[in-house]
Amino acid sequence: MKIHIVQKGDTLWKIAKKYGVDFDTLKKTNTQLSNPDLIMPGMKIKVPSKSVHMKQQAGAGSAPPKQYVKEVQQKEFAATPTPLGIEDEEEVTYQSAPITQQPAMQQTQKEVQIKPQKEMQVKPQKEVQVKPQKEMQVKPQKEVQKEQPIQKEKPVEKPSVIQKPPVIEKQKPAEKENTKFSVNVLPQPPQPPIKPKKEYKISDVIKKGSELIAPQISKMKPNNIISPQTKKNNIISPQVKKENVGNIVSPQVKKENVGNIVSPQVKKENVGNIVSPQVKKENVGNIVSPQVKKENVGNIVSPQVKKENVGNIVSPQVKKENVGNIVSPNVSKENVVIPQVIPPNIQMPNIMPIMDNNQPPNIMPIMDNNQPPNIMPIMDNNQMPNMMPIMDNNQMPNMMPIMDNNQMPNMMPIMDNNQMPNMMPIMDNNQMPNMMPIMDNNQMPNMMPIMDNNQMPNMMPIMDNNQMPNIMPIMDNNQMPNMMPIMDNNQMPNIMPIMDNNQMPNMMPIMDNNQPPNMMPYQMPYQQPMMPPNPYYQQPNPYQMPYQQGAPFGPQHTSMPNQNMMPMDNNMPPLVQGEEDCGCGGESRLYSPQPGGPQYANPLYYQPTQSAYAPQPGTMYYQPDPPNVFGEPVSEEEDEEEV
């Protein structure tokens, strides 16, 4: 019989294993213990000496612990990938351990919770309780178990148990698991394979991962080849014959296209911002009318341009020299959109001089023509605000420059013409609201400016004609209210006088002909009156819309019989209107079109053949009668209606 003095961290289970005594035998021998699961340091424990020979046996414990060791080994092998697999073993100890071991487990848990938890962290060297964890985890990690797997079970347990607690400090992750592993001393021998398996798996995973990742990385092509088909120098528009350098927007420019040339037909060297058309040789920049035979460059909307129309050609059947935003087709030779304007023309306030014509405020001078505010100068024509300069024509805000023509917001440039919102470019005509400008005809509200004709309210300025309110002045024709004066024709109210024609109410006098109050005139100034755009109202009036692409667009509110007319040069829509009959048999429209409403070719008393409502966003606006592109035959009703 031996007497063991309990030390910190000792439990009956540890003492039994230390001396190789059966736990039940040790428990029966020490009957003085009121609670075998709770022993205090300094207590004397009787250890029977008869069972000393059990130390030399292969199984340090009784038969039930051997079974437990086997089960624990199986459990550990299953849980090898996780270093916390010992926690999984705890479940096995409660379930698979025989009943004789359950009190020991309870005792160890209580003692471990009370004493060892504090002392394991503070003084782990003196405690035997750390021993199973040392053996369970310290040995497989250090791989010392190759030499001493059996010795720690048999003789090493007595002296070395107290010497090996410092190893626990190295492996402090085991401290989390200290509370439940007084029983886990036996499964030490199966753990040596666990460590190499962990290392082997990790190394293999790293190797395999590197092998798997490396080929993928090697397969991945650097530089993120995003856009195939981009061959050389960011050449956006095809058909560029010879000298496309950098971002060239309009291809097929023959000889000397220098710096943002807006109006073609300049004889030899188009340099700087040239605004006036009828430049003979080199058509560069925004040419609106197609049918140029030879050199169709960049965003040509209508084909059949004979010779050298470059960039943004909108209206077909222009024979030779169409320059800068020409809207009306069937112009024989040299129809210029901004007629009667001498290149060094009216300038805006706060504008640097030497601008060819109509520039907005806060614009750098020497711009070819109509630019929006906050635009870098030297732009070919009609650009949006916050745009990079030197763009061929009409670009959207926040767009990359050097786009051939009408682009959408947040759209890639180089779109041929009229595009939908958030749509890919190269749409021929009829665009919806929130569309880019420079549309052949009939645009919806919230459209970008630089439209050839008929624009809706809330449009950007610098349109060849018919601009909305809050538009910069010096526009060739038809401007909205709050416009600067000296406009060629059709200005809105709150406009300075000296306008050639069509001014709104609250306007200075000297207006040539009628405009509806608060309405966009939408009439083409100085155009050949070759067609009756509105069959019901044919009038020898230069301010009519000639031959537009699409349905005929008649002059807005011009030459309409009305007794209550203002004493202006030409009939204006009645300011005080009564129920009147135009004599055409159609309904009479008492009010002028409101901003945002459908701006169609319907004059005040035109028989409504088109929708009364503006096209909704997302739907294409189609011309009601496409065949009647060039007007309808004059009917007898026109003769009755004309005054």
Curated annotation (Swiss-Prot):
Pfam families the UniProt entry points to: LysM (PF01476)
Keywords noted in UniProt: Repeat, Sporulation
Disruption phenotype: Spores are extremely permeable to lysozyme and are blocked in late stages of germination.
Disordered, as annotated region: 115-160, 585-643
Keyword Repeat among record annotations: yes
7 X 13 AA tandem repeats of P-Q-V-K-K-E-N-V-G-N-I-V-S as annotated region, ranges: 238-328
NCBIfam families given in the database record: spore_safA
Designated name of the protein: Spore coat assembly protein ExsA
Natural source organism: Bacillus cereus
Gene from which this protein is expressed: exsA
